[in-house]
Amino acid sequence: EYGKTEMWYVVDCEPGASLYFGVNRALTKEEFKKRIEDNTLTDVLYKADVKKGDVFFIQSGTIHAIGAGILICEIQQNSNTTYRVYDYGRRGADGKLRELHIDKAIDVSKLTPSDTSDKQGKPEEIPGGTKCALASCPYFTTEKYVVDGEVEIDVTGDSFASLVVTEGSGKVVGSENEVEFKPTDSLFVPAGSGKIKI
């Protein structure tokens, strides 16, 4: 397997927080492996300082790590694949160090710099608020809605919708029920639900 494509939305962070994604220059597989072995890999990773509202699109095969003091909302391709090359000495439920997957990671990792530009669109005015495209790929599409009143979304039969609340409270009203929400709530809306109001 070749990993999974992900998108990170920074919900909140402490001052000076940062994360890593991709390499800051081209590497050979040999150098990549040596840097893992001698614990100098972060020297050649792209380090990004973050602020609330930042968006990072991480293609499969891109090495990445979230630093301390960051709360993200992660949207990802449906895949259970994770290859660890470093794990901060963390232990699993059994008390043993979690498995590393260095050889597999070397085989599938993208060892050229990633596109680090911000891809999110500009907010557009819609009835009841604004909508902004954050990321779109074959596996998912993400949009950010800022609601100042009532916003209507059409959940077609093409896909379900996952609503993640980062700020504020309110309710989602569908044709058959309504659900109240608050920050950090995540709501699943089945495909074909039709028009819902937030």
Enumerate the predicted regions with their spans:
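Conserved metal-binding segment of the jelly-roll/cupin
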Residues: 49-68, 75-77, 181-195
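C-terminal functional regions that serve as terminal interaction/effector modules
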Residues: 162-163, 186, 198
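Active-site region of the double-stranded beta-helix
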Residues: 1-52, 67-169, 173-175, 179
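Hydrophobic beta-strand residues in large extracellular and virion-surface proteins
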Residues: 172, 196-198
